[in-house]
Amino acid sequence: EDQVVAAAVAAGVDGINLDFELISSKCGVHYVQLVRELSVKCHQNNLVFSVDNYVPQSYNSHYDLKEQGIVADYVVIMAYDEHTEGSYEAGSASISYLQDGIEKTLKKVSADKVIAGIPFFTRLWFETAKSPEQLSEEAGTEAASYPNKVSSKALGMEEAAQSVVNAGATAQWDEKTQQNYAKWSADGGTYRIWLED
């Protein structure tokens, strides 16, 4: 912690944002101790201290939002990438995902400490039907319950809007996700995009 805080002070920044991801439940208690210690060091040096977190789920409870809310100045909820690059389903971050993340966080952290991180990017998803062979290979796995193979690439806001125009598609409001949505067929599959505008 000393080196991180010293570097922040030397650089003249306002604070430190801690963003450790994919921490195992086994390491949770040690991570929370790091958060406590780094918080003390930041406050001793007049630095603001914030911690990034996934949307609260049972599998990441070891991040201990309640304790973070006590020791950190801000608890940031990364309310984006509901479905990530490797997901079986497409869609970036629906309004229900954002709302759920905020509501769960507010049960453990004071509202004046919560920051909801929202995306300034989206993903262009490409879906193709899986072959019978692929489905057979996936039998008995979660992947087998999805008939399409999905891939995606991240796009900035302007690039995302331009991809819809370039495809000759029209985005329409999707009431469920509360986002503009477009899809089109090309390259032997279906492109889908949810626009964060």
Task: Please name every model-derived segment.
Residues C42, Y74-M78, Q99-I102, A139-S145:
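Glycine-rich loops and low-complexity Gly/Arg-rich segments
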Residues V76-I77, H83, D100-A129:
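Active-site region of glycoside hydrolase catalytic domains
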Residues E1-I95:
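Chitinase-like catalytic core of GlcNAc-active glycosidases
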Residues T122-D197:
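Glycan-binding loop/region signatures in secreted carbohydrate-active enzymes
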Residues E67-E82, L106-K108, P119, V150-T170:
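Surface-exposed substrate-engagement region within the catalytic domains
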Residues E85-K104, W184-E196:
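Gly/Pro-rich active-site loop or hairpin
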Residues N45-N46, K107-D112, Y146-N148:
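Structural alpha-beta junctions
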Residues D64, S94, S110, L155-G156, ...:
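Helix N-cap and loop-to-helix transition residues
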